[in-house]
Amino acid sequence: GALNAADVSFDKRGCDKALRRWPDLRVRVAAAVETQAQAGFFHCKGAGRWRGRALKECRVNSRDAGSVRIAFSVEGGRATVVYITQTLVRRDFLRELDRFLGEARP
């Protein structure tokens, strides 16, 4: 079936700080991932790998945080958000994500 907001979970390490700081993010991010899924992730770009799974990334607008960029993986109708940051420039975001994941891309 289609992925919906209820199928979106958050990995503690890369999300907790942002979710605590900006209360509306949990709902906004889950809704954004659902919307992206309905569009076939057309607006998402690749962003490396996490635990052997391909990551996608996109921007999410939030009332509390302004804009954030997220990285998430999708598998079997479920999504896991791995990282949330206010770093919006894609190149800088990827560098920051690489550092977070602890694996440099050549």
Language-model segment annotations:
Residues 19-21, 52, 62, 83:
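Helix-centric, low-specificity signal for extended rod-like, repetitive segments
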Residues 34-63:
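A short, surface-exposed loop/turn module that caps and links secondary-structure elements
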Residues 27, 46, 91-92:
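Positively charged, low-complexity intrinsically disordered regions
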Residues 1-34, 106:
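Arg/Lys-rich, positively charged N-terminal/basic patches that mediate binding to nucleic acids
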